[in-house]
Regions:
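A short, conserved beta-strand element in the Rossmann-like catalytic core
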Residues: 4, 70-71
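Cyclic nucleotide signaling catalytic output domains
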Residues: 27, 54-58, 64, 68-69, ...
């Protein structure tokens, strides 16, 4: 698949993300095929788990592009406040490590970041 077709698929993924979250959530593209979602006022980890499972279902699809079928899926790393700190960089790093765990395990899933240890947490706040 060429760059133009790949960009079209990424735009469709961005639209899926935008339409899957609340208006108060922030959805953005970090670059390449990586996106970020910042969710506020989360009542429980179960709400996030439910959103992740729904999103993975929406992302599992096959596109026809240039006469070829292209299958996509998603992998999600999740970091929560205050478990991983409050600063964006630390939350991003935790989510990135969780994402790596998903990809290492075979992709197509989600993982919550581990809680930061007390020394890391003190640095993060």
């Amino acid at each position: 698949m060429g760059h133009v077709q790949g960009d079209l698929v990424l735009r469709e993924v961005a639209e899926i993300l935008r339409s899957s979250f609340r208006k108060t959530d922030i959805v953005g593209r970090l670059g390449g095929d990586e996106f970020i979602v910042l969710m506020r006022d989360i009542k429980s980890q179960e709400n996030v788990r439910s959103s992740a499972e729904k999103l993975l279902g929406l992302l599992r699809r096959t596109y026809k592009r240039e006469g070829r079928e292209v299958s996509i899926s998603g992998s999600i790393g999740i970091a929560m406040v205050p478990e991983c700190g409050r600063k964006f960089k630390h939350l991003y790093d935790c989510a990135d490590q969780a994402l790596y765990s998903v990809k290492y395990a075979g992709k197509g899933g989600y993982c919550f970041a581990e809680k930061a240890d007390s020394r890391q947490k003190a640095e993060q706040e």
